[in-house]
Amino acid sequence: MDEHEIAWAAGFFEAEGTACSSKRRDRPSRERNMAVYQGGRAAIPEALLRFHGAVGGRGNITGPYRDRLFHWSTKKNAAFDEVMALMWHWLTEWKRAQLRTATVTAGRKMPPVCADEADAPPTLRSTQLAWVAGFFDGEGYIGASGAPGRRTIEMSIGQASTDTVPVTLARVALVLGVGNLRGPRTMANAWSKLPQYVWRANAFGDVQFAVAMLWRWLGPVKRAQAREALLRYQALGRAA
């Protein structure tokens, strides 16, 4: 398997994935569930198809639910363990803890490669960038706005946290080497009552650099958004 695609999948799972255990309807034991969600209507989102391929075709994609949501998921123990093991070395401790809790509460043992003392393989900068691209494909924003002489551009990723800067955002800032970490900020939105942190790049040069670094591993949706933002920003400059 391509380790860059696995690193991308791990980043995407950090952004959009979840793992838990729940009681089974037909017996007293608990079962694990791993899922990744994406909005979509007419067709399965490309990002879910890519994730499915990156984890070796394990799990299933279903939807749309209520005509707006698809998800990849697996409840099979073998597939759960295999997907967890594939992504483990690129996951943050927060996501590892979620997978570990789901496994332990279901009465299962962690795969040896996922043991706390397991050594991580050497991590290439290219796989770090692939992870960031996956995370950005899931949670990122890029856009340009304004008018001639008053143009702005922004590339950002927001995350909620109860206490400190999320390790995911710290990793993004470290790998890309541009932009700033900001927060915490209390949001007015009803959907999130937790303080919000954000990694953000507002300088055109920083945004252009970050896009160039991630381009090889970004999905088509974020590529199109990035291209549109950069071109719009430049067009507003020419019109000034």
Q: How does the language model describe each region?
A:
Residues M1-A240:
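Internal intein/HINT superfamily modules and their associated LAGLIDADG
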